[in-house]
Swiss-Prot record:
It comes from Haemophilus influenzae (strain ATCC 51907 / DSM 11121 / KW20 / Rd). The gene is brnQ. Branched chain amino acid transport system, which transports leucine, valine and isoleucine. Belongs to the branched chain amino acid transporter family. This is Branched-chain amino acid permease BrnQ. The keyword Transmembrane helix applies.
């Protein structure tokens, strides 16, 4: 039986898994830029940064695992997409980046050691071995993350949020030109889209499904019920946090001068509010947020790759990905970001469309035709966005791409994909009549 306490613990686990260090340091800059429009901007951010991943999580939990989203694609295409997804959000790019964030934003400000390659390696080794200790047995993840790490993280974040609303550092300033000239809700939507949490939801859905299965929750109706209930807990927590961080950014004029990212704004704000203790509070928040995401993503990646061969089990892949993360994290953040972004621009739209098609699947007259044709269009346009990001897109194609709606927001794929989806449904009906 899944009790109310179990729902709360699962909800807190989902919250902690999504709440990576990047999710904490990104909203303050958006809040600072949106200024007096911070409420509508944060609403847009929450819609795409919280609601969309939540919907994806429910869909994947019902299916049982993320790979079920690709079952109607050719096997090579589905496997290729998932391998790229898990490597991108996992030990090849995102997890080394999280390790670097923990090192540079949590450890170094404490001033306990010098900043050099040896210290970075030792920190990466210890940090990832601690994470591996939590993930080596997947059945302990809900317990370790939901019962221990999340409450500690919440205490620190709530302390910051309450203090920010009680004692804001500055009056809310006028919005930047981008927010002044455009509808702040739409900019917030785009900003939330850039969190890439839909990709993480595909990975985390399997963790939620296993957590429910461990409590003998296997019926679809019950999976939906408890996933929505637990997910609602995480939605409330994440939305509350994001609104707080947007407000922090909107009232940060006194400390934001010269800041190039939200992490700097957050760090300065916390240090002013809490004095010398602020450095330790900041370190605690970043380390716990980084650790929970590291545990969740690496565990999900190991679980997926363990399906390929019985010779290489979950512990083997967990150890391998931990070693990869430690190795890759020795490179700088700039290099990691430069390589990661093009991969994300390619696969994120595909993930969104896969979730959309899953909702429509039972109503499609020709499932495989709609999947293949719609995703082909999505991949073509998202590939253009990816190549354009690294300045490898031919100018002739780039000039044509600019004529598509939302191309300036990096979403040129959206309208052509929807057009192809509708067209494929009509074509599928015609094909169905022809063969009947």
């Amino acid at each position: 039986m899944f009790s109310r306490k179990d729902i709360i613990v699962l909800g807190m686990m989902i919250f902690a898994l999504f709440l990576g260090a990047g999710n904490i340091i990104f909203p303050p800059m958006e809040g600072f830029s949106s200024g007096q429009h911070w409420t509508s901007a944060s609403l847009g951010f929450v819609l795409t940064g919280v609601l969309m991943p939540f919907i994806t999580l429910v869909v994947v939990a019902i299916l049982g695992r993320g790979e079920e989203l690709t079952k109607d694609l050719p096997k090579w295409a589905g496997t290729g997409f998932l391998v790229i997804l898990y490597l991108t959000i996992g030990s090849t790019f995102a997890m080394p980046r999280i390790t670097n964030v923990a090192y540079e934003m949590a450890w170094l400000p404490l001033g306990l050691t010098e900043n050099n390659a040896n210290v970075r390696f030792v920190f990466s080794l210890i940090f990832n071995l601690i994470a591996m200790g939590f993930m080596i047995s997947p059945n302990t993840i809900i317990s370790s993350v939901g019962k221990f790490m999340t409450p500690a993280l919440l205490v620190l974040l709530i302390a910051v949020a309450i203090t920010v609303f009680i004692s804001p550092l500055s009056e809310i300033q006028a919005p930047s030109n981008a927010y002044e000239n455009s509808h702040s809700l739409l900019i917030g939507l785009t900003s939330g889209y850039q969190t890439m949490d839909v990709l993480a939801a595909i990975a985390f859905g399997g963790i939620v499904a296993r957590a429910l299965s461990a409590k003998n929750v296997t019926k679809t109706k019950d999976i939906v019920k408890y996933t929505i209930s637990a997910g609602f807990v995480s939605v409330i927590l994440l939305a509350g946090l994001y609104f707080s961080l947007f407000y922090l950014g909107a009232t940060s004029a006194a400390v934001a001068e010269g800041a190039t990212n939200g992490g700097q704004i957050f760090s300065r704000y916390v240090n002013v509010l809490f004095g010398s203790a602020g450095t330790w509070i900041m370190a605690g928040i970043i380390v716990l947020a980084s650790l929970t995401t590291l545990v969740g993503v690496t565990s999900a990646s190991a679980d997926y790759f363990s399906k390929f061969s019985v010779r290489f089990s979950y512990p083997f892949w967990a150890a391998l990905f931990t070693a990869m993360t430690i190795t890759v994290s020795q490179y700088g953040l700039t290099d990691l970001l430069r390589i990661t972004i093009p991969a994300l621009l390619l696969i994120y739209p595909v993930a969104i469309v896969l979730v959309l098609l899953q909702f429509l699947r039972k109503k499609l007259p020709s499932i495989k035709f709609t999947y293949n044709s719609t995703l082909l269009v999505t991949v073509c346009f998202s590939l253009c966005d990816s190549l354009n990001n690294v300045k490898m897109l031919p100018e002739s194609i780039n000039s044509l791409l600019k004529h598509f709606p939302l191309s300036s927001e990096g979403m040129a794929w959206l309208v052509p994909t929807l057009v192809m989806l509708v067209a494929s449904i009509f074509i599928g009906k015609a094909l169905h009549k022809t063969h009947s």
